[in-house]
Amino acid sequence: MFTTKHFIWIGICILFILIMNHYAKKEDFTLQNACYFFMFICLLSETTKMMSDMIPSTHGGMHLNPQSLPFHICSILLFIAAYITFGKDGPLKQKMINFFAVVGTCGGIAAILIPTYGVEFNVANVYQCFMYHATLTWFSLYLIRFKHANLGMQVFKNNLVVLFALLVFNLYMNSILAVYDTNFMFIVRPPLEGLPFLNLNHGYYIYLFRVIMLGVIGLSLFHLPFIVKERKSCETESDFNIA
């Protein structure tokens, strides 16, 4: 973590995001254009992961390593992206866009900064991890920049509820799949050893509390500028109506 190779990967990801931001603006990407591009990267990413993470089955043949099942928060966003791409317009789709924009940005950046697959240049999953999360970050920022996402107080509350529901869901999933040592959403143990804040030095429950608090604080700080802007807009509109 934060080695020379890691900084190279971070630089590649930042460059990719900047290039895609510029290209999307220059070509005036529609939401559908951006969705199709992201889904293409998702397809490549999942294909790479499946090809790399197949393991021998007990009774012959092979199966996907249960640790690679799509229950991490960034992997769950694959399904949300599919609905955004192919689903009907409406309140549900808008809620998914709102959730995706925030969690995708935070999750993508966190995954780039904490490389759980390592940073080696000769491992396929490393390429898959960095490029997927770089694209995820770009797409999430695209949703915000081009005003497809609406981020206010009510959206903050909705996103908090959904995130907590996913936390509870993965507490169950990690328990069901405990024999396979899964760690979805990193609520079993830290994503990497030796992290300064996310560690088990003070016991599991302190660690879990810190994970939850980081999620709540991160979500709150992300929404804060939009909530302030929304409130100012409401006050301005109210003053105008009075006048």
PLM regions and their residue ranges:
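Alpha-helical transmembrane segments in multipass membrane proteins, preferentially the mid-helix core
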Residues: 16-22, 80-83, 135-154
